[in-house]
């Protein structure tokens, strides 16, 4: 068998390209431009076909059919965080509109009050279909989540007019309300200390935000980790001062049960639409929220 001389073939290809270079300019480039346009058109048609098929498939899922048979979407929300809670209730309305567009808008949505301790149990026992109540995928990985709708910075907070201090070997207050899963603040602190071990930071655990802030006022600790939303919530009750230092963000998302992935995907479709046409920004402003907290979605 004759042995192939790849060097000769490469030289011949290089020679041909020099004689007939590929260009997109002028008359010589017209065939290539046409071919490129045809390719881009076919690719666009393929992508549109894929995306247009996704929504009907989601809307035909068993969990969506169950909600449509009931004609009511049950959403767990919070009432103790006015600004963000108002946004979340409006997102619940948008999701109900998506799932039950032909139902009576006065009855198609049932808002069920939840808190950090009851949100996931109500998902588990079927009391609610989804939760839109300041929950993050870092809290419990067994559930399904939409893309995030709010990024909440986790700030280092001290007493107002308190003395200056250094972080070295400090004990920081962190809320950890149950033994089943770590709080987002504790996870952020652990991630930070893993890369800044020389600081010797330690976590002092408290069962609730009032317990932790009471300890801060008593001088038991000198600083705490507190999401910005809670800084605003407790700022009128406690003499606290947030610093500009953030340990990261807690990204809140629409949460669906472990057997209802389509509801999380539909939540993503709803949020994508609200972001694309600017309605999410308008919702933020209507509830006094900073549009800079709208998460940057990764491609």
Regions found by a protein language model. Name each.
Residues 74-99, 155-207, 229, 266:
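Bilobed "Venus flytrap"/periplasmic-binding protein-like clamshell domains
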Residues 1-32:
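N-terminal Lys/Arg-rich, disordered targeting/topogenic segments
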Residues 29-35, 48-58, 89-99, 161-181, ...:
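Extended ligand-binding regions for polar small-molecule ligands
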Residues 78, 148-158, 228-272, 290-299:
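Periplasmic-binding protein-like
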Residues 30-38, 58-134, 205:
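Extracytoplasmic small-molecule ligand-binding "clamshell" domains
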Residues 118, 132-142, 214-249:
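A ligand-binding cleft/hinge motif common to bilobed small-molecule-binding domains
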Residues 60-63, 87-95, 115-119, 127, ...:
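Stable alpha-helical elements in mature extracytoplasmic
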Residues 96-104, 124, 128, 190-194, ...:
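Sec-exported extracytoplasmic/periplasmic mature domains
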């Amino acid at each position: 068998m004759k042995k192939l001389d790849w060097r000769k073939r490469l030289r011949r290809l290089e020679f041909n390209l020099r004689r007939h270079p590929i260009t997109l300019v002028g008359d010589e480039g017209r065939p290539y431009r046409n071919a490129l346009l045809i390719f881009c058109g076919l690719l666009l048609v393929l992508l549109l076909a894929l995306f247009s098929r996704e929504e009907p498939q989601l809307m035909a899922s068993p969990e969506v059919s169950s909600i449509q048979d009931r004609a009511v979407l049950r959403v767990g929300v919070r009432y103790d965080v006015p600004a963000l809670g108002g946004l979340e209730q409006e997102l619940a309305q948008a999701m109900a509109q998506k799932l039950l567009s032909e139902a009576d808008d006065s009855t198609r949505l049932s808002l069920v009050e939840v808190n950090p301790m009851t949100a996931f149990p109500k998902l588990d026992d079927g009391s609610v279909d989804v939760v839109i109540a300041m929950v993050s995928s870092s809290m419990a990985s067994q559930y399904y989540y939409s893309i995030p709708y709010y990024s909440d910075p986790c700030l280092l907070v001290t007493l107002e007019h308190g003395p200056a201090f250094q972080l070295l070997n400090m004990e920081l207050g962190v809320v950890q309300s149950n033994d089943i899963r770590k709080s987002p603040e504790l996870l952020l602190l652990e991630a930070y200390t893993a890369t800044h071990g020389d600081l010797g930071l330690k976590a002092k655990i408290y069962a609730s935000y009032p317990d932790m802030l009471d300890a801060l006022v008593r001088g038991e600790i000198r600083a705490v980790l507190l999401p910005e939303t809670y800084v605003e919530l407790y700022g009128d009750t406690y003499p606290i001062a947030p610093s500009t230092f953030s340990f990261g963000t807690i990204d809140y998302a629409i949460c669906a049960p472990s057997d209802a992935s389509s509801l999380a995907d539909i939540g993503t479709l709803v949020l994508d639409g609200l972001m694309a046409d600017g309605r999410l920004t308008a919702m933020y402003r209507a509830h006094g929220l900073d549009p800079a907290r709208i998460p940057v979605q990764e491609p």
